[in-house]
Amino acid sequence: MDIERINDHTMKFFITYIDIEDRGFNREEIWYDRERSEELFWEMMDEARDHDDFFIDGPLWIQVQAVDKGIEVLVTKAELSKDGQKLELPIGVDKIIDIPLDEGIESLFQQELVEEVEEQAGTNFNEDGTFGFLIKFNDFEDVISLSHRLIFEDIKDELYSFEDRYYVYVEFDEVLHDEEEIDRILSIVLEYGEESTLTIHRVSEYGKQIVKEHALETIRNNFPAKT
């Protein structure tokens, strides 16, 4: 397994499928068996602690991506705000995004996140300085309503369908969007949908891409707002 320290808050792991099998796991169970995937994860974190003194002292954000020969895992330390109402997540040099912990986005962070590590597969942190959110919608009408509520500028957005649900993937550039703007946009988006527990990689691979780019604009131009 390869371990790379990105910064004080983030570690990157790459583990091959051969290494995974040598540890007594198989490919299927690390994706579909929560207990076994957590067991593998904590093995990896133990090695990170021994390798580079990467200690766990609070909640984590975890991104898992499947590649040809194995999986890549990005682990970022986060902290609760002093009032316990927000999760403070480093997204760059001297930049922190505040995610409110309230009933409106309880699917994004469950209450136990305050006390223990919780995997959030729907959020993706990329090496190019962008990070994305995968939002699930139970009804296409909710996507239409959102498209007439928000107009995106310099934000990548795509629309997918998967297992009778709709998914909008939105991607922000930390250079173009400050944390206050991102907080505002996410709070509106999550009035209509909920943070997905799936990764964008799984939805894009096994689902159907409906709109490749400018998804909300395309929907807004083709579907009238409900009155």
Curated annotation (Swiss-Prot):
<dbReference type="GO" id="GO:0030674">
    <property type="term" value="F:protein-macromolecule adaptor activity"/>
</dbReference>
<keyword id="KW-0749">Sporulation</keyword>
<dbReference type="GO" id="GO:0042174">
    <property type="term" value="P:negative regulation of sporulation resulting in formation of a cellular spore"/>
</dbReference>
<dbReference type="GO" id="GO:0030420">
    <property type="term" value="P:establishment of competence for transformation"/>
</dbReference>
<keyword id="KW-0178">Competence</keyword>
<dbReference type="Pfam" id="PF05389">
    <property type="entry name" value="MecA"/>
</dbReference>
<comment type="subunit">
    <text>Homodimer.</text>
</comment>
<dbReference type="GO" id="GO:0030435">
    <property type="term" value="P:sporulation resulting in formation of a cellular spore"/>
</dbReference>
<dbReference type="GO" id="GO:0045808">
    <property type="term" value="P:negative regulation of establishment of competence for transformation"/>
</dbReference>
<comment type="similarity">
    <text>Belongs to the MecA family.</text>
</comment>
<dbReference type="InterPro" id="IPR008681">
    <property type="entry name" value="Neg-reg_MecA"/>
</dbReference>
<comment type="function">
    <text>Enables the recognition and targeting of unfolded and aggregated proteins to the ClpC protease or to other proteins involved in proteolysis. Acts negatively in the development of competence by binding ComK and recruiting it to the ClpCP protease. When overexpressed, inhibits sporulation. Also involved in Spx degradation by ClpC.</text>
</comment>
<dbReference type="InterPro" id="IPR038471">
    <property type="entry name" value="MecA_C_sf"/>
</dbReference>
<protein>
    <recommendedName>
        <fullName>Adapter protein MecA 1</fullName>
    </recommendedName>
</protein>
